[in-house]
């Protein structure tokens, strides 16, 4: 009950308006003001700028430019594993999908069908499969990479709420990740289909993919979908470790994998910090 009480103010906040305003401000070029905002952000969240391809704070013209900064080559080596972590962040939850339900936090599950935008046929492909939910904090690197090789088959933008997605909110808001705005990316891989979902949150100005660019805004009320032929000559093909998208202000990634002999890294546990490229899982 205490967790639900702690998130009560989020139900009352004008989250859409706050997010639109934050996105507007973060995209403006304000010279020394922008530099000072970035400097304070780096100090508050202890961002490691030595890993950034551009370590000079003054080189970033906008806050979004800084927030989606690239890393230096080689600072995130790829592990020898079938699936690697697609982000820097922290493990929220991971495990099996049972009876169309995904574990969110103690006392909370949510529907796989709802998560993917109501597509029951798509959700059925992951019955008895596996999921992993990874949280990106403000200090983290905010580009998302591929956990394995994949060919894009479909992308869906699902409008929704914009609750915060931090651990406290995950424990206090039922069905959080299936309620928030999200971009659902469906890929074909040598091991079958998998889904990588970018979940929006309060202050997340937008989400973008490398093949489409900015997906949102616009923020309408209808689900939007784009189909891609994974076998076409011009198919979108991304290799393990390649960038697939980014958050313009942070959030959460949820991945779905079909039933099979998938074994997660034995070192993984909820709350553990992770880095892009580390071993996530292997097939037996």
UniProtKB/Swiss-Prot annotation:
The record's section on Pfam families has: PS_Dcarbxylase (PF02666)
Give the CC-aspect GO terms: plasma membrane
Where are the active-site residues found? 88, 145, 251
Which catalysed reactions does the entry list for this protein? a 1,2-diacyl-sn-glycero-3-phospho-L-serine + H(+) = a 1,2-diacyl-sn-glycero-3-phosphoethanolamine + CO2
Under Enzyme Commission nomenclature, its number is 4.1.1.65
What GO molecular function terms would the record report? phosphatidylserine decarboxylase activity
Q: Which InterPro entries match?
A: PS_Dcarbxylase, PSD-B, PSD_type1_pro
Subcellular location(s) of the protein? Cell membrane
Give the co-factor note: Binds 1 pyruvoyl group covalently per subunit.
**Could you say which residues are annotated as the site Cleavage (non-hydrolytic)?**
250-251
Q: How does it sit in the membrane?
A: Peripheral membrane protein
Cofactor(s) recorded in Swiss-Prot or TrEMBL: pyruvate
GO biological process terms held by the UniProt record: phosphatidylethanolamine biosynthetic process
Q: Which family does it belong to?
A: Belongs to the phosphatidylserine decarboxylase family. PSD-B subfamily. Prokaryotic type I sub-subfamily.
Q: Which HAMAP family does this one have? A: PS_decarb_PSD_B_type1
What's the protein here called?
Phosphatidylserine decarboxylase proenzyme
Q: Name the lineage.
A: Bacteria, Pseudomonadati, Pseudomonadota, Betaproteobacteria, Burkholderiales
């Amino acid at each position: 009950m205490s967790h639900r009480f702690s998130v009560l103010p989020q139900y009352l906040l004008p989250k859409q308006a706050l997010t639109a305003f934050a996105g507007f401000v973060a995209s403006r070029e304000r010279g020394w003001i922008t530099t000072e905002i970035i400097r304070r952000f780096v100090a508050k969240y202890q961002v490691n700028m030595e890993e950034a391809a551009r370590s000079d704070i003054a080189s970033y013209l906008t806050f979004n430019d800084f927030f989606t900064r690239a890393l230096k080559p080689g600072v995130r080596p790829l592990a020898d594993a079938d699936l690697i972590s697609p982000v820097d962040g922290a493990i929220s939850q991971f495990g099996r999908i049972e009876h169309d339900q995904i574990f969110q936090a103690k006392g909370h599950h949510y529907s796989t069908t709802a998560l993917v935008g109501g597509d029951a046929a798509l959700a059925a492909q992951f019955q008895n499969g596996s999921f992993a939910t990874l949280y990106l904090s403000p200090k983290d690197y905010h580009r998302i990479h591929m956990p394995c090789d994949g060919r894009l088959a479909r992308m869906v933008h699902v409008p929704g709420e914009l609750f915060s997605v931090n651990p406290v909110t995950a424990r206090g808001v039922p069905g959080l990740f299936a309620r928030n705005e999200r971009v659902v990316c469906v890929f074909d891989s040598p091991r079958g289909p998998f889904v990588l979902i970018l979940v929006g949150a309060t202050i997340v100005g937008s989400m973008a993919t490398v093949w489409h660019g900015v997906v949102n805004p616009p923020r309408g009320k209808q689900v939007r979908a784009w189909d891609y032929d994974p076998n076409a000559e011009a198919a979108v093909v991304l290799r393990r470790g390649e960038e697939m998208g980014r958050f313009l202000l942070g959030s959460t990634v949820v991945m779905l994998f079909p039933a099979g002999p998938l074994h997660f890294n034995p070192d993984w546990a909820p709350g553990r910090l992770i880095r892009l490229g580390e071993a996530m899982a292997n097939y037996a």
